[in-house]
Amino acid sequence: MRAAFGALLALSLSFTSANAADLLDQDFRRLAGDEVVNLGKAYSGKVVLVVNTASKCGNTPQYEGLEKLYQEYEDAGLVVLGFPSNDFMGQEPGTEAEIQEFCRLTYSVKFPMFEKVSVKKGNAHTFYDQLAA
């Protein structure tokens, strides 16, 4: 856990607050919902960890660690944002409703989850292209 937090801190230092504000000024729909959230407005002043997720891969158990990290540091200003993606060997094939149910029932995920997106270079959502730049 300490290593993950250290890596997060190191990554966060590579962005200035102006870069982060520009990057986060994007709208995403909540997973399996209609509510649209502007990340910049909703998470201004927070340390933001963005993760692409999949429910049927070897790393799926990381939901548990991500939720623990979120619960432990939420009051200190950390937010974990999950973005399901089916880009890697079809490991997130379900509907958004199925993904949401799986995350809640299997790992008690409470950190914010957003619409299913493409994260792979070439087809990536603009947000992920900007993260990779």
Identify the residue ranges that each predicted region occupies.
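Sec/Tat signal peptide C-region and signal peptidase I cleavage site
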Residues: 15-20
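Amphipathic alpha-helical repeat scaffolds
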Residues: 52-56
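Positively charged n-region of N-terminal signal peptides that target proteins for export
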Residues: 1-4
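A short beta-strand-turn-helix
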Residues: 26-47, 68-73
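Terminal helix/beta-alpha structural elements that buttress the NAD(P)+-binding lobe
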Residues: 25-27, 115, 129
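Bacterial N-terminal signal peptides
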Residues: 6-14
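Conserved hydrophobic packing residues within short motifs/helices of P-loop NTPase cores
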Residues: 48-51, 81
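Structural microenvironment flanking redox-active thiols in thiol-disulfide oxidoreductases
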Residues: 59-126
